[in-house]
Structures are given as structure tokens and as C-alpha cells.
């Protein structure tokens, strides 16, 4: 029996197809993860790992020093800090509210946070096997990622993202 959405999918543009694939992967990860996390929390946890890298920390410090600390900035600071506090409550990160690096706060992964990120990576690899991503598919995806990366990179750089 043919899949009921086969014809609809055949007519979709690339953007819609990419969205379906991304949603499938995230659904698989969230359904099989040993802890309940929202999609945004998974993304935030990954950002903590990324921001621990010395290069990324230097960029954040530099952007924070240049930032206009107006009311809108402080509102965003509070919103992000509240999101990080939810991860801290789950024991995934530690928040330093008085770091000695010039930032208003800094976050570090805990052992549990590292374990959850490893579990997420394992689940993503399982999902790749389930949906049948081949080496040829992976090469096409790498090319698409490289070709599209510059758009988001320039945007983040222009906006001076530091949170």
C-alpha cells in the first residue's frame, strides 16, 4: 500500500521537504530521550556546549563589550537567563552569575548535560539509520549545508548575537 502522503510530498518544494525531515529527526530524538526536553531546550543545551569553546567565548565577550546595554537588551538578557535556569533546574548546566570574563553570566555543562548531549547524538545517528541516509545523501547534505551556512552566519554576525 502506498504511503497516504506520497503524492503530497512529491509536490512539495525543497523548503517543505527540509522541514519534514528536521521535524522527523527532532520527534524521534524527543520521543526516545531519557529526559523530557522541549526542542528549544535541546537547541539551547547545544549552544551552551558551543559557547564553552574558547573562540566562541571570545566572540561573545567582544560582542557584549560593544553592545548598547539599553532596556531592550536587559529584557533579552533576562529572558535568556530564565531559559538557561530551566536547564540548570534539570541539572544539565551550571550558571555563573558573576563570571570573571566580563559577561553578565556564563553557563557550563554538567556531567549530566554532557551525557544528554551524547544521548541526543546517538539518537540522531539511530534516526539516520531508520530513515536510510546513505553516504551519497550525506555528501549532498554537506554541500547544501555549506552553501546555506553563510546566510545564518552573516545574520548572527550582523546582529551581534551574544546570548
Task: Specify the residue positions occupied by each region the protein language model found.
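N-terminal leader segment of winged-helix/HTH proteins
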Residues: 1-39, 90-92
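Basic amphipathic alpha-helical segments that dock to polyanions
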Residues: 79-90
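Basic, amphipathic "hinge/linker" alpha-helix immediately C-terminal to the N-terminal HTH DNA-binding motif
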Residues: 99-120
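Terminal interaction helix/tail motif
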Residues: 118-163
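N-terminal helix-turn-helix DNA-binding core of bacterial DNA-binding proteins
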Residues: 27-79
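Alpha-helical hairpin
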Residues: 36-37, 109, 133-137
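A short, conserved structural fragment
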Residues: 88-98
